[in-house]
Amino acid sequence: MTVGKSSKMLQHIDYRMRCILQDGRVFIGTFKAFDKHMNLILCDCDEFRKIKPKNSKQPEREEKRVLGLVLLRGENLVSMTVEGPPPKDTGIARVPLAGAAGGPGVGRAAGRGVPAGAPMPQAPAGLAGPVRGVGGPSQQVMTPQGRGTVAAAAAAATASIAGAPTQYTPGRGGPPPPMSRGAPPPGMMGPPPGMRPPMGPPMGMPPGRGAPMGMPPPGMRPPPPGMRGPPPPGMRPPRP
C-alpha cells in the first residue's frame, strides 16, 4: 500500500524539524502546519547561519538567532529532516480543572456581591451616620398626616411651654401692626405729603373734652379777634 506525501507530513506534526534553505541557512523549529506548496509553519524556531571570515586563515563561525513563529515559503526549502521527537507536555491541559485546588498564582474570576460569612466593614466613628431613634425629629412629626394637623400639633406643643409668646402661622393672619400716634385710623386717608398731621387729644381721653373753653377743635383756624368762638360741644349757641 502506497503512503501519500500528505500522510508522511502528518506523521511529523509537532516534531522538531531541521529545514535547510537555498541560501544555506538552517531553521530548526516545531513543525505545526503545511500546505500543498510545502509552505511550513514552525514555532519556537531558531535560525543558524555560517558567516565566512574576512581572513581566509580564520575558520567559519556559526551565528544563532531566535525567531519564534515562522512562516517558511516552500520555494526556498531544499531539505527537511527530523531533529527530535515532540515535547512530552503537548497533550497536557494547561488550563486548571474546575475541581483542582487553587494555589498561589492561579487566576480565579471574582464573584459578584459579598460572601455570606464575610464581616461587614465598619465606618470610622467620626464618619458614621446617626443611629435610628437617637436624635432628630420624632416619628410622629415625620409621619405624613392631613393638612393642618402637623401645624396645629406644633403650635400646641409651643404653647405648652411656660412664658413662650404666641406664634402665628404664616399666611393665616397675625397680630395687628402697632399704630403710631399720628397715623390715621384704618380706612381713612392720611394728610398729603409735606403737611404735618393734626395733633389729637391725649391717649385715653375722648375728643372734644380735653381742650380748654373757647378753643377751636384741632385742625380748625381760630376766629378773628372780636368774635366769639363756637360753643363747646354739647352746648346750645346763645340766642341773639
Swiss-Prot record:
Signal peptide: none
Domain of life: Eukaryota
Gene Ontology terms for molecular function: snRNP binding; telomerase RNA binding
Sm domain ranges (all copies): 4-86
Region listing for Disordered, in residue ranges: 164-240
UniProt xrefs under Pfam families: LSM (PF01423)
Record GO cellular component, one term: U7 snRNP
Principal subcellular localisation of the protein: cytoplasm
SUPFAM superfamilies: Sm-like ribonucleoproteins (SSF50182)
Region spans: Repeat-rich region: 175-236
GO BP annotations, alphabetical order: mRNA splicing, via spliceosome; spliceosomal snRNP assembly
Location(s) in or outside the cell: Cytoplasm, Cytosol; Nucleus
Quaternary data: Core component of the spliceosomal U1, U2, U4 and U5 small nuclear ribonucleoproteins (snRNPs), the building blocks of the spliceosome. Most spliceosomal snRNPs contain a common set of Sm proteins, SNRPB, SNRPD1, SNRPD2, SNRPD3, SNRPE, SNRPF and SNRPG that assemble in a heptameric protein ring on the Sm site of the small nuclear RNA to form the core snRNP. Component of the U1 snRNP. The U1 snRNP is composed of the U1 snRNA and the 7 core Sm proteins SNRPB, SNRPD1, SNRPD2, SNRPD3, SNRPE, SNRPF and SNRPG, and at least three U1 snRNP-specific proteins SNRNP70/U1-70K, SNRPA/U1-A and SNRPC/U1-C.
Protein name: Small nuclear ribonucleoprotein-associated protein B'
Source species: Gallus gallus (Chicken)
UniProt gene name: SNRPB
